[in-house]
Amino acid sequence: MSLEFGFILINIFTAIVSFSTLSHALLHPSSVSHNVSRSRYYMTTNELWFNQTLDHESPNDHRKFRQRYYEFMDYFRSPDGPMFMIICGEGPCSGIANDYINVLAKKFQAGVVSLEHRYYGKSSPFNSLATENLKYLSSKQALYDLASFRQYYQESLNKKLNISSGGSDNPWFFFGISYSGALSAWFRLKFPHLTCGSLASSAVVRAIYEFSEFDQQIGESAGQECKLALQETNKLLELGLKVKNKAVKSLFNATELDVDADFLYLTADAAVMAFQYGNPDKLCVPLVEAKKNGSDLVVTYSTYVREYCMRIWGLRVRTYNRKHLRNTVVTADSAYRLWWFQACTELGYFQVAPKYDSVRSHQINTTFHLDLCKSLFGKDVYPKVDATNLYYGGDRLAATKIIFTNGSEDPWRHASKQNSTHEMPSYIIKCRNCGHGSDIRGCPQSPMVIEGKSNNCSLPDYVNKVRQQMVEHIDLWLSECRQSIRSSI
């Protein structure tokens, strides 16, 4: 296997940057910065590079690859200010976003760095994403990447500050949303000596094989009227596919999807986007009205999908096309193949239709997911979710100084840690449009809200209260960390 050291040119304006979430699995829209200028959206887009170890578990493999990162030091209080590490997740990392972490960095006079996840964006070790080249793509290797980079950056910072070798480290705090939120929690679990604490926002720490709770939450968040309208729409879609297949798919600009279940996965994800990212009325108001008026539900739903999911939130049909997902050439859309590999090997999160009262087609079942995994990566691929939960602890991980936050309407909260303890406080942010990463992104979570402002949350006081608790925990843990550092000198 040849290692590709040169970076791959990918020009993508990614929505949440450090916290991008992809469809099918964590469902992150690829363009949520609608009508927001690039300069206001980012704290920095200046690319920096780090030579990362390919295989941290092999003493004999010394291969390296170039890993992209960013730094923002405008608020840093030299020489002993804290360092905030923003973990980039399962997508290209185009810079450091101007969200609520920017507000926290300013408050705590922190420097900020952000590391792109291996294989994603411009941090691809190989020029081919064939299955055999993906064996180094795992959460475990990603955690080692973070540890190695953290050590490298601290040493570089010490040199800049003229601190002698062996001098004390700055206090570090880790941040992440969704999968990167899980990485933030897992990093504190596995490398407690390298961080003073972690914020795990909407952190999916529990790997799940059959994730039926996901759809149950969507139905709950939708409310009875909207749920019934969604269920009727699904039945009409399934019937329409049998009698006028291409005509139905053309309403959604999705005629390229030859496999009907792939199309039904797209239409299910489109509904999820409304609740997960704080825009429930964009879907429910027109759909419920259409049902009451006797209007065509499929046409109404397709209008929502085209006008909002595709035009504003960046939903792309080809990322549901398994022919496209089998493409091993590194492209701007490679993240979808890469995330499916992680789902198919260690994390699962298979969003299957519940047996009763489902808001998605029953064709989206376990067999569908397993067949897709085999179609993309070969017959030997299987999600080892039990091993993942044994290794990290699932939602019962035994760690300290981790803040867990979840939006009340976010279906992914059922894969997070929702019970609170003294060492690992957990907060549910309750409001009508509080979804994925509301504590960092504000409301709605898409399109982008500068500095994650809570003004447009249906109950902003709930968001602000949780944020105040976050500040108090970070302040306490950084203080304890500084005291520990001073006592060790």
Swiss-Prot record:
GO molecular function, one term: serine-type exopeptidase activity
Chief location category: secreted
One GO CC term, this protein: extracellular region
Localization terms from the record: Secreted
InterPro entries per record: AB_hydrolase_fold, Peptidase_S28, Ser_carbopepase_S28_SKS
EC number from the UniProt entry: 3.4.-.-
Family that this chain belongs to: Belongs to the peptidase S28 family.
Function, in words: May be involved in a proteolytic pathway controlling the nuclear division phase of megagametogenesis.
UniProt name for this protein: Probable serine protease EDA2
Encoding gene, per UniProt annotation: EDA2
